[in-house]
Amino acid sequence: MNLEGLYRLSAEIERRFPSLGKWQAQGLALACWGLIIQQQCQISRMAEALPEWGAFNTVRQRLKRWISNPRIDVTSACYEWIAWVWSSCQFKRPLLVVDETKLSDRLAVMMVSLAFEGRAIPLVWRCYYANSALDYPQQGQVLLIYGLLAHVLSALPAAVRPLVQMDRGLAHSSAMLRALK
């Protein structure tokens, strides 16, 4: 393992995420490093990539605790993430992509991403149980998307006016078109 790379990542995360405490930032760096090495986001796979940090079960448990830590201010961390991504790209007119993805019939994710070199960098998202009227966000699809986009826009410089792209199922709603004007 390239520990120097992990330490540089940890220092950069501490600098870019001032809302996180030192240990929270190190936990994020460890999770990111495991993700980068394994190119998978399953906690057990990430833990396999980090043997220098302890036994497999110890590292896996550490990652699980970090992910479920209620003391992490997710809203601030997302804002800081968006600002970091934006400062690294410097687009004049960014393209934001809105997409809803369902993972079988268990989980759905509504996500706003930044289109970059043929890829999408996730900026902000909301997860909920798929195919369940009770668990679907109460505000409905239009206000959910509007809220996610508003969160992204609040982190961008005031002069930036991004283009928004979404698939037909989301974009052809008259309520959506009114909300985005």
Task: Annotate each language-model stretch with its function.
Residues M1-K181:
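Conserved, well-structured functional cores that handle cations and Mg-NTP chemistry
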